């Protein structure tokens, strides 16, 4: 932050920010984009909520609705058309939805037009009804890029899937021959695959069903004759028949039929020419003959004999025969007639409703086969007859498409055409001849991202298709009685599909909210799993591996360690997703060795075959590459190339990795595997009691904190008006002439109030709390940090603490990555964190009567109820422990259903305690803490005077707000119009309000701005002679009307809430929530880690006096095992340790960006500057004996994190508890309060020791001998000897299984 010396800038937390030394040598040319742009842009492009109706583009929801309509009935009497859609404002705030367990959503309303006529033949529609219809509610994205669904904050993860288009691949047959295939993958519709085989033929597979020859498909689409097909591939040769060429003809194949006009004899095409046939042709009077071209090794062009081979093996000779073959192979039965077979083929590939390549699919095919299309069109231009046939087929395809759509065809055709099929065959022929390359399926040009908007669009397509079917059924069953669009539409159809997607889809995830970095990474994640994607079991090594096209697009480091490795990735810092779904990364253009300032966003396809260099290449003062040959990158190679050949340069050293990996200082000195762990473990760091930013950072800390939306930023320049722990008020500067709108955003002329989040529970039970950084009267600039969150310090991400570390073994306690801590870290709450747990109790109306929250619980002591209020809910501030009552609740007993008379008597005389049972909610085992918040929601409608009074108060409140808004508007209008000349203003009744050429003064403005006339004035025509003023007046009026509408909507919403009561999930009458805060200090068993993958478990907490100490008597805070460094190859932690020590001594912080940070020499210089040894080692003394250790020890300050793997959540013990219903064995796991599994190998161990009694106990009374364990319990309680064990229940289960197989098993108790 820049400080102006003329003004006072004081921060609440720290009056003098710590100076920061930046080690970066290369400055990034452009700043990284907003890290949440991926989510926000995708969603808002889908719904286009801020775009005026007339300017909405054909994308997202608009496109889906346009494609779903019009809907007609089978008789052609009704036509339901789509006009536009709109949204209402969300009914509840984000906080309300989280507290009440509701969905943060908006209602979708669609304007539809229903037309009707008496007879299908009538040209004009008789009458039309236009109506706005409610189509359901859509979850709405919050400004943080998340969705609130049933009270839970969720994220929709982007999916990386195979791009639609054409993909060429190869496979090797066991005999060693290469086979090639081409797969055309549409967005919607049947897949078609062309495949060569070992017999040199091309087959076609549709939806991986039975195959048929490609020539049959070409015939079926219109190229009926052999000659037509051969002509497409230039395989027809006209040979003059002379005695010299007679020998050449023998052995060749006829390309067309030869007819002897005198005898009527026919020699059909595909016949091999013999001497007799040559004589026959000459006798028939032919001077020349058309034959199939033959290929020898001397031919210049590609060998196309594969087409000839395919034709020779084709059983069809006409279009009709080919159609029959195609139909039979795909439908497994004969076609009823040729028209049915033809319409089936047309429906499969040429019907836009059934087959859709999509914009991306068409773009990919056009890009991939551009040369083949050129060759094909160039060749057809020289073949008039063939071109005429091809044009006829094309017209036919266009006509087929047109018959399914009322709109004229424009732009790209999104169905297959015959040109596509022929071009694919052209490319296959090139592949067979080794003149083309197969595609790499893992190349990012062949994989695209489906963001949240596209996934929602797909759900709407499904929902609207179901709705369309229902509408058609309703229209077909209707007679000519009047119906409106609202009678046809069932809103539940669409909203149920969308709700199901958010609740159950693999890509809709419960947000990881451990800290701001975890939250942001979750939103930038790209998954190859999910519907239509890969599965863990099927995915091989290649698809998981890092590909050269990932450079600058997907992070090569950040990915999970388990079975999902490589399938889930993170977008790189600079990566963006273009409108076609391909990931782009920025590059600077290099021309003739000179680096320009032009920055282009390139997809993997754009970058292919280009030469790029890293940003670290030396440049001279003219921005020319200073060395003749540079090590560049092209595809997956790193050749030395002349500087003039370079096309692009990176924009930043950070662009290769994701935000989490970019937070690791000295990443370049860490092994990739450990860097992966470091990136992943930062996401697991719990926010601590006091946040502390790292001494050694990378410069990305501020970017992550800001873009995660965890800090509050100033929206403009202004002065802080008020600061408390609950809110911050900033009065922004307003430019009277230009900034018209800002004055209406708040009634207080530019005053904006920011409510601070205080002790909010996250999804992972961590604590989110904001605190102000500014003071009253402070001047702030746009982008300044106004408030920190629980994981930031002065606007920088702060996930851990800087602690003094020594790398040395200590009495074996830090063996195998164990960590030794000083007690100081416990006493001073250095690694103490706050965890907030939410407990929920609800009241339902059961069959036996309604449950009830109460503190009047039968048979419970007054002491146990001491902390409950009159509603039976624990008071705020109460310290609670295991088994304490949080919410008192009684529920009716289930002996019998009460009769109406009994219900009446109980209502009059009160309930007997014997009729209810205690169903109170208690604090679970192993938990203690302080109640920090309680909430009670009731569905019951408020009654009596109470509600009337509240509505009156509400009306007065909103009347005042409206009056205040109008007053502000009029004041602002006067400011704009004062002294300007009028153009003549009339009311809607025609009354002259302001004469033409009149100057606006106080008297004129008083008449003009009279409130009754205000809404009737037409401001569009302009009110002054100045266009600029008119524009500002229009903006002001528009904003005023919007604000007024919002105010009235808000008034109606609040009245609705008062009248109806709290909205709760179905079936729940009352809902109580209790929030308990726990303060957890660091303890033995907690997991800790640095940022370099150096993780470990706290093994020992030593008294401060026992810790190793320096010569000046200062003890270290933490002791790490030095053996954890060399084999893990994460040397970055040693650089960080030494530089952190220097920073602590000098009182400065360091910024060392990855691949662009401090060198070994610079670290040494900083140590020397601080008066510390340049090698970072000093002599330490044993805290127990006071003696000096033999060797010097590396010490310094390292940034350590406390991870959310706390021992309190993991340690667990059970004596008795729940049992499995069938086997009667104890359940497993802490969540089920289960026992420890005594498995097969443990049994072997006891067998090996011969411990027969213990073994018998383990397998019977301690497990599933139901009678035996009850008797054992009684014996222990009574102090008697233990009984003999009985039969384990699992043995009985085995007996029943065998009896189920028909084997009679009897247990013989007799001992022989």
Curated annotation (Swiss-Prot):
The record's listing under InterPro entries reads: DNA-dir_RNA_pol_bsu_ext_1_sf, DNA-dir_RNA_pol_bsu_external_1, DNA-dir_RNA_pol_su2, DNA-dir_RNAP_su2_dom, DNA-dir_RNAP_su2_hyb_sf, RNA_pol_bsu_bac, RNA_pol_bsu_CS, RNA_pol_bsu_protrusion
- Keyword NAD tagged: no
Give the E.C. number(s): 2.7.7.6
**MF GO annotations:** DNA binding; DNA-directed RNA polymerase activity; ribonucleoside binding
Pfam families documented for this protein: RNA_pol_Rpb2_1, RNA_pol_Rpb2_2, RNA_pol_Rpb2_3, RNA_pol_Rpb2_45, RNA_pol_Rpb2_6, RNA_pol_Rpb2_7
UniProt keyword terms in alphabetical order = DNA-directed RNA polymerase, Nucleotidyltransferase, Transcription, Transferase
Q: How does it assemble?
A: The RNAP catalytic core consists of 2 alpha, 1 beta, 1 beta' and 1 omega subunit. When a sigma factor is associated with the core the holoenzyme is formed, which can initiate transcription.
| Name of protein | DNA-directed RNA polymerase subunit beta
What this protein catalyses is: RNA(n) + a ribonucleoside 5'-triphosphate = RNA(n+1) + diphosphate
One annotated GO biological process: DNA-templated transcription
The protein's matches in SUPFAM superfamilies, at most eight in alphabetical order, are given as:
beta and beta-prime subunits of DNA dependent RNA-polymerase
């Amino acid at each position: 932050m820049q400080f102006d010396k003329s003004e006072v800038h004081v921060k609440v937390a720290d009056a003098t920010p710590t100076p920061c030394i930046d080690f970066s040598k290369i400055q990034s040319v452009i700043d990284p984009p907003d890290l949440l742009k991926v989510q926000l842009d995708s969603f808002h492009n889908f719904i286009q909520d801020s775009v005026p109706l007339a300017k909405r583009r054909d994308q997202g929801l608009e496109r889906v609705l346009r494609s779903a309509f019009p809907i007609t009935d089978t008789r052609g009497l009704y036509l339901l058309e789509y006009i536009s859609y709109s949204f209402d404002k969300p009914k509840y705030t984000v906080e309300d939805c989280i507290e009440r367990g509701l969905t943060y959503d908006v209602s979708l309303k669609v304007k539809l037009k229903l037309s009707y006529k008496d007879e299908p033949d009538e040209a004009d529609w008789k009458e039309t009804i236009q109506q706005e219809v409610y189509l359901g509610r859509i979850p709405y994205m919050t400004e943080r890029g998340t969705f609130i669904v049933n009270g839970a904050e969720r994220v929709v993860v982007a999916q990386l899937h195979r791009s639609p288009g054409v993909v060429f691949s190869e496979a090797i047959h066991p005999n060693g021959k290469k086979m090639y295939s081409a797969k055309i993958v549409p967005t919607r519709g049947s897949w078609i695959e062309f495949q060569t085989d070992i017999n040199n033929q091309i087959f076609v597979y549709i939806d991986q069903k039975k195959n048929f020859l490609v020539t049959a498909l070409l015939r079926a689409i219109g190229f009926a004759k052999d000659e037509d097909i051969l002509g497409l591939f230039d395989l027809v040769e006209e040979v003059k028949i002379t005695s010299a060429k007679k020998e050449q003809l023998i052995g060749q194949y006829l390309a067309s039929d030869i007819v002897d006009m005198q005898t009527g004899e026919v020699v059909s095409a595909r016949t091999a020419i013999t001497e007799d046939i040559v004589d026959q042709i000459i006798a028939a009077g032919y001077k020349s003959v058309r034959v199939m071209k033959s290929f020898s090794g001397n031919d210049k062009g590609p060998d196309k004999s594969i087409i000839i081979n395919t034709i020779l093996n084709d059983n069809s000779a006409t279009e009709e025969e080919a159609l029959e073959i195609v139909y039979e192979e795909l439908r497994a039965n004969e076609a009823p007639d040729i028209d049915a077979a033809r319409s089936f083929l047309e429906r499969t590939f040429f019907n836009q409703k059934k087959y859709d390549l999509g914009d991306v699919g068409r773009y990919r095919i056009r890009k991939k086969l551009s040369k083949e299309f050129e060759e094909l069109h160039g060749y057809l231009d020289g073949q008039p007859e063939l071109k005429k046939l091809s044009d006829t087929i094309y017209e036919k395809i266009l006509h087929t498409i047109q018959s399914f759509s009322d709109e004229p065809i424009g732009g790209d055709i999104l169905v297959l055409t015959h040109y596509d099929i022929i071009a694919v065959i052209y490319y296959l022929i090139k592949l067979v001849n080794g003149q083309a390359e197969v595609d790499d399926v893992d190349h990012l040009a062949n994989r695209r991202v489906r963001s949240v908007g596209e996934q929602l669009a797909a759900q709407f397509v499904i929902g609207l298709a179901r709705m369309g079917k229902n509408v058609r059924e309703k229209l077909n069953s209707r007679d000519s009685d009047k119906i409106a669009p609202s009678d046809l539409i069932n809103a539940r159809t669409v909203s149920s599909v969308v709700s199901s997607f958010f609740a159950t889809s693999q890509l809709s995830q419960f947000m990881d909210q451990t800290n701001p970095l975890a939250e942001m990474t979750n939103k930038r994640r790209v998954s190859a799993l999910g519907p239509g994607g890969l599965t863990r079991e099927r995915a091989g090594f290649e698809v998981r591996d890092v590909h050269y096209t990932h450079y600058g697009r997907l992070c090569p480091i950040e990915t999970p360690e388990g079975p999902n490795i490589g399938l889930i990735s993170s977008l790189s810092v600079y990566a963006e997703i273009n409108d076609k779904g391909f990931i782009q990364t920025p590059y600077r253009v290099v021309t003739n060795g000179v680096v320009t300032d032009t920055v282009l966003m390139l997809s993997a396809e754009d970058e292919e075959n280009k030469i790029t260099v890293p940003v670290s290449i030396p440049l001279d003062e003219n921005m020319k590459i200073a060395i003749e040959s540079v090590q560049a990158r092209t595809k997956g190679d790193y050749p030395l190339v002349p500087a003039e050949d370079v096309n692009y340069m990176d924009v930043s050293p950070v662009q290769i990795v994701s935000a989490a990996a970019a937070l690791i200082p000295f990443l370049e000195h860490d092994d990739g595997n450990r860097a992966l762990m470091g990136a992943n473990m930062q996401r697991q760091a719990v926010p601590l009691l006091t946040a502390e930013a790292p001494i050694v950072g990378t410069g990305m800390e501020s970017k992550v904190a800001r873009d995660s939306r965890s800090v509050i930023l100033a929206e403009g320049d202004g002065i802080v008006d008020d600061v408390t722990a609950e809110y911050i008020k900033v009065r922004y500067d307003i430019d009277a002439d230009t900034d018209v709108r800002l004055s209406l955003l708040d009634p207080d002329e530019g005053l904006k109030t920011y409510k601070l989040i205080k002790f909010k529970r996250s999804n992972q039970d961590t604590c989110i709390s904001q605190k102000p950084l500014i003071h009253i009267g402070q001047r702030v600039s746009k982008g300044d940090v106004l408030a920190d969150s629980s994981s930031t310090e002065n606007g920088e991400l702060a996930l851990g603490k800087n602690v003094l570390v020594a790398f040395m073994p200590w009495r074996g306690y830090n063996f195998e990555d164990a960590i030794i801590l000083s007690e100081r870290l416990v006493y001073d709450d250095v690694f103490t964190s706050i965890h907030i747990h939410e407990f929920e109790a609800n009241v339902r109306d059961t069959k036996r009567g309604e449950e009830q929250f109460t503190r009047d619980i039968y048979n419970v002591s007054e002491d146990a109820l001491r902390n409950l209020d009159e509603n039976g809910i624990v008071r705020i501030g109460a310290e609670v422990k295991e088994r304490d009552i949080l919410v008192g609740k009684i529920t009716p007993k289930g002996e019998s259903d009460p009769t109406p008379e009994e219900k009446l008597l109980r209502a009059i005389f009160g309930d007997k305690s014997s009729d209810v049972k205690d169903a109170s909610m208690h604090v679970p085992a192993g938990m203690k803490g302080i109640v920090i918040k309680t909430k009670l929601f009731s569905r019951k409608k408020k009654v009596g005077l109470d509600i009337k009074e509240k509505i009156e108060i509400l009306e007065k409140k909103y009347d005042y707000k409206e009056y205040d808004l109008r007053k502000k508007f009029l004041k602002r209008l006067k400011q704009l119009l004062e002294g300007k000349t009028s153009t003549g203003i009339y009311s809607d009744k025609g009354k002259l309000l302001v004469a033409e050429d009149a100057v606006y003064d106080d008297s004129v403005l008083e008449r003009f701005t009279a409130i009754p006339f205000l809404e009737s004035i037409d401001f569009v025509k302009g009110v002054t002679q100045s266009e600029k003023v008119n524009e500002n007046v229009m903006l002001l009026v528009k904003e005023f009307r919007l604000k007024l509408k919002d105010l009235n909507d808000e008034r109606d919403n609040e009245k609705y809430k008062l009248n109806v009561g709290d909205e709760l999930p179905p079936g729940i009458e009352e809902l109580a929530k209790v929030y308990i805060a726990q303060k957890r200090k660091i303890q033995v068993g907690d997991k800790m880690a640095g940022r370099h993958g150096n993780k470990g478990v706290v093994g020992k907490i030593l008294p401060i006096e026992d810790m190793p100490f320096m010569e000046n008597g200062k003890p270290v805070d933490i002791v790490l095992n030095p053996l954890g460094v060399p084999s893990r190859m994460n040397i970055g932690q040693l650089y960080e340790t030494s530089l952190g020590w220097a920073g602590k001594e000098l009182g400065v912080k360091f910024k060392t960006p990855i691949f662009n940070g401090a060198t070994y020499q610079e670290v040494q210089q900083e140590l020397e500057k601080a008066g510390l040894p340049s090698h970072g080692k000093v002599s330490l003394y044993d805290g127990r004996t006071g003696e000096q250790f033999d060797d010097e020890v590396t010490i310094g300050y390292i940034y350590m994190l406390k991870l959310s793997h706390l021992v309190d959540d993991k340690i667990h013990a059970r004596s008795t508890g729940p049992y499995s219903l069938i086997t009667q064995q104890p359940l497993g796991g802490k969540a089920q309060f289960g026992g420890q599994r005594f498995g097969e190998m443990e049994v072997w161990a006891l067998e090996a020791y011969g411990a027969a009694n213990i073994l018998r106990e383990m397998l019977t009374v301690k497990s599933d001998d139901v009678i035996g364990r009850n008797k054992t319990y009684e014996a222990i309680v009574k102090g008697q000897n233990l009984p003999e064990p009985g039969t384990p229940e699992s043995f009985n289960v085995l007996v029943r299984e065998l009896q189920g197989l028909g084997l009679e098993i009897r247990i013989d108790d007799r001992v022989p």
